[in-house]
């Protein structure tokens, strides 16, 4: 935002008719012969009243034709000075000054002209000569002081200004002090002195004008505009004051309001003010500079009002018109791009501006670039930036060279960015370590503890996150970031009523907030219907379990939540496969209800199964219970279990069964699951299956995850010689690796690929141990939080009854919310 250039608005001694002392000098300098000349006398009177052109034309013509007397030469210099013809004064002085009788008035005129032309040294020499002739002349001393200030000789200017106190009227002396301070960059001291001058001479319009100039220079824009109402200022200065007042509203609009209801009041005032100014200035050719500047500054008011599309539209219009958009307005445009989920454009602007002036970059500027890079999926660049920022700022700094140290807020910004970069890089353990250290050393910092709770939740510890947030709730109970994070934790804990209450409050209070919108979106998705589909298609397989040409599909449609905890569902399933004894087909139609509450999940299902031997009633009850953040106990019981092998169903054999399992999940990187599953077949066979599965993350980065999996499983059956695969005893050992690699990601849209490889062994009673080989490749797509779908091509060689069979097939799944 442009500042008022006080040096261009400074008052000078250019117009001598404003100063009584100068008029007295001129009157005394007129020779008797000139006074006797009536025409010449009339021209001089005209000049004194401000019309200098006639006498200047007369003297110029006479000088060219007849030459001028010494007194006329002195008059010529004086009147040219009145007219503000500084270059002409200097030329006349150089030509005739040496021949003239030295008087303080002529010397002052020449000194003033040199000063206006920024020729400081000749001006200072003339001021000193004039002061030697009239040391008690306050006007000369004042001119000398102001020229010293212009020349950058601040110390001497202050010394000479102190000497002038006894020579000048108090108001004039304070005004001189103000000029010296302003020239040296002490703008607030200048305003203080101008305030004293104004108090001493409230009716002096010159002092009032300079006071307004200093108010504007110090960005005290609204008082400056109000004080200017009684003055006759140049239109360009008046427009600048109006623009500054509107720009001040823009600056204030970014400051947190006292209450949430008032947060847009100032921004709306700024927009209304700009609408008025733009309408007023648009048709005026002489006001186009002010008009264009107002268009640029208005971008800030639009940004503060969260009219991001308007910010981008106006910014692009300015660019298309070839307008030069200053850096601060470009940052506004970049912020709007980031809000509108166009991080590539935001990163380009932030990166260019930060690189252009690295020494002027603030921690806030680097934070903007960090999030633009992160949201543009330039995670490695963002991590490097966070590392640099964390090392750039010291923990504490000295203020005003005092011996005590003050805490440095920028240091905390750098450390927070570093921790956030670990989250983006999926190094949650390091992010937790860093945030724990920061939060425990600053327990009263609610923001740090909210960030720590978010990492707890990402690591699979919603109860620990809930406890952390509860501890800091008393610091600022109505904090929006706190309520949003509490909402996500409630969702993780299946506290649906709490989720709705928090989401309602947050979106009502801050509908423009991106974080609030994302939270509300998550809540809306929770309240949608859900469609689940999974299936498989055999390509080249002839194993005894699934048969050849096998195909299966299962679908379930869940209703939106009912009374917070309930969902109804209906399902359909179809399986087919070709076996030696014929083609097997199974059709299922099911319906049921689901209950979800804190720590508990229950699902009950009634199904009609038709597998070629009439319609049969199937029942299932499944449940799990969370003991804490690490342990979960679950199980199910079923009549006509859906896990019954298709080959058994084809031969008219059904099974009842169940399972019991216990899962331990240390964090997002490590888990174990032990299970046992007994089954009773209608042919009298009793089967007991057991297993232990483990997963350990080996590597993780922003775009990849590598997990090692281990499967230990076995079974035993009470009968042999049955028409389905039924080993007396068997045992499987299968370690494998799974690599998940992100191909594309843009906010909630992601496309990834998966690689699987495993090699182990299989032992079956009465047969030799033989190897198992597994390979797989798949891809997944997730979109906007409502769609998640994947497909995988799998290859397996598995021994059955001592013979290794090859199985090639495709599995697929889809989850869609609507």
Residue ranges and their predicted role:
Residues 29-84, 90-93, 105, 240, ...:
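N-terminal leader/linker segments that initiate helical-solenoid repeat arrays
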Residues 4, 9, 62, 96-98:
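Short, low-complexity, charged/polar intrinsically disordered tails
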Residues 13, 17-18, 29-33, 98, ...:
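Short, intrinsically disordered, low-complexity terminal segments
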Residues 1-35:
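Gram-negative bacterial Sec-dependent N-terminal signal peptides
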Residues 15, 19-24, 35, 116, ...:
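Compositionally biased non-globular segments, especially hydrophobic aliphatic-rich helices
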Residues 71, 75-78, 86, 91-93, ...:
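Gram-negative and organellar
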Residues 27-30, 34, 79, 113, ...:
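N-terminal leader-region detector that preferentially activates on the first domain or presequence
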């Amino acid at each position: 935002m442009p500042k008022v250039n006080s040096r261009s608005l400074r008052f000078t001694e250019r117009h001598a008719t404003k100063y009584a002392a100068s008029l007295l000098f001129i009157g005394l300098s007129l020779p008797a012969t000139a006074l006797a000349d009536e025409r010449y006398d009339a021209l001089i009177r005209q000049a004194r009243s401000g019309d200098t052109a006639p006498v200047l034309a007369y003297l110029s013509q006479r000088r060219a034709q007849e030459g001028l007397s010494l007194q006329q030469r002195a008059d010529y210099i004086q009147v040219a000075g009145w007219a503000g013809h500084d270059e002409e004064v200097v030329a006349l002085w150089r030509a005739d000054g040496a021949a003239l009788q030295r008087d303080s008035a002529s010397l002052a005129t020449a000194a003033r002209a040199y000063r206006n032309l920024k020729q400081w040294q000749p001006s200072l020499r003339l001021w000193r000569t004039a002061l030697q002739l009239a040391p008690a002349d306050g006007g000369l001393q004042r001119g000398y002081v102001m020229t010293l200030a212009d020349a950058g000789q601040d110390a001497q200017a202050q010394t000479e200004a102190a000497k002038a106190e006894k020579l000048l009227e108090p108001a004039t002396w304070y005004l001189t002090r103000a000029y010296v301070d302003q020239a040296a960059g002490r703008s607030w001291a200048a305003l203080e002195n101008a305030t004293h001058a104004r108090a001493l001479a409230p009716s002096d319009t010159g002092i009032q004008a300079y006071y307004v100039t200093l108010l504007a220079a110090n960005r005290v824009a609204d008082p400056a505009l109000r004080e200017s109402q009684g003055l006759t200022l140049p239109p360009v200065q008046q427009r600048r004051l109006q623009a500054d007042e509107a720009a001040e509203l823009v600056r204030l609009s970014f400051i947190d309001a006292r209450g949430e209801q008032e947060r847009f009041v100032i921004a709306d005032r700024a927009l209304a003010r700009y609408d008025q100014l733009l309408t007023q200035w648009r048709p005026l050719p002489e006001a186009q500079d002010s008009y264009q500047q107002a268009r640029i500054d208005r971008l800030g008011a639009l940004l503060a009002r969260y009219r991001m599309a308007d910010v981008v539209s106006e910014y692009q219009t300015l660019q298309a018109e070839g307008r030069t958009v200053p850096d601060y307005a470009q940052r506004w445009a970049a912020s709007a791009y980031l809000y509108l989920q166009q991080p590539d454009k935001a990163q380009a602007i932030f990166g260019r501006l930060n690189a252009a002036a690295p020494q002027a970059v603030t921690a806030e500027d680097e934070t903007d670039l960090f999030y633009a890079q992160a949201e543009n999926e330039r995670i490695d660049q963002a991590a490097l930036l966070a590392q640099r920022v964390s090392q750039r700022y010291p923990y504490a700094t000295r203020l005003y060279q005092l011996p005590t140290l003050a805490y440095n807020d920028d240091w905390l910004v750098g450390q927070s960015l570093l921790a956030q970069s670990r989250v983006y890089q999926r190094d949650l353990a390091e992010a937790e370590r860093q945030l724990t250290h920061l939060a425990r050393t600053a327990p009263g910092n609610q923001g740090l503890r909210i960030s720590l709770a978010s990492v707890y939740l990402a690591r699979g510890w919603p109860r620990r996150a809930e406890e952390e947030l509860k501890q800091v709730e008393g610091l600022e109970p109505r904090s929006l970031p706190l309520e949003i994070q509490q909402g996500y934790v409630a969702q993780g804990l299946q506290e649906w009523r709490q989720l709705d209450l928090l989401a309602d409050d947050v979106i009502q209070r801050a509908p423009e907030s991106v974080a609030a919108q994302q939270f509300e979106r998550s809540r809306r998705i929770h309240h949608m219907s859900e469609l689940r589909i999974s299936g498989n298609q055999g390509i080249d397989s002839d194993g005894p379990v699934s048969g050849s040409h096998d195909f299966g599909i299962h679908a379930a449609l869940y209703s939106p939540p009912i009374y917070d905890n309930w969902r109804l569902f209906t399902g359909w399933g179809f399986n087919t496969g070709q076996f030696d004894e014929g083609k097997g087909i199974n059709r299922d139609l099911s319906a049921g209800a689901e209950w979800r509450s804190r720590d508990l999940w229950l699902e009950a299902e009634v199904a009609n199964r038709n597998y070629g031997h009439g319609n049969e009633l199937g029942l299932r009850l499944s449940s799990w219970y969370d003991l804490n953040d690490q342990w979960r106990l679950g199980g199910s019981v079923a009549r006509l279990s859906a896990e019954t092998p298709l080959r058994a169903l084809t031969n008219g054999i059904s099974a009842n069964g169940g399972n019991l399992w216990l899962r331990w999940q240390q964090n997002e990187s490590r888990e174990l699951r032990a299970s046992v599953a007994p089954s009773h077949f209608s042919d009298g066979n009793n089967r007991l299956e057991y297993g232990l599965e483990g997963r350990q993350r080996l590597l993780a980065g922003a775009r990849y995850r590598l997990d090692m999996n281990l499967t230990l499983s076995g079974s035993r059956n009470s009968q042999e010689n049955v028409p389905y695969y039924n080993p007396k005893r068997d045992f499987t050992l299968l370690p494998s690796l799974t690599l998940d690699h992100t191909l594309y990601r843009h906010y909630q849209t992601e496309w990834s690929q998966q690689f699987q490889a495993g090699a182990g062994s299989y032992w079956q009673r009465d047969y030799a141990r033989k190897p198992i080989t597994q390979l797989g490749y798949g891809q997944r797509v997730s979109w906007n939080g409502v769609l998640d779908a994947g497909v995988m091509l799998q290859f397996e060689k598995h021994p059955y009854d001592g013979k290794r069979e090859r199985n090639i097939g495709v599995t697929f799944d889809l989850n869609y919310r609507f």
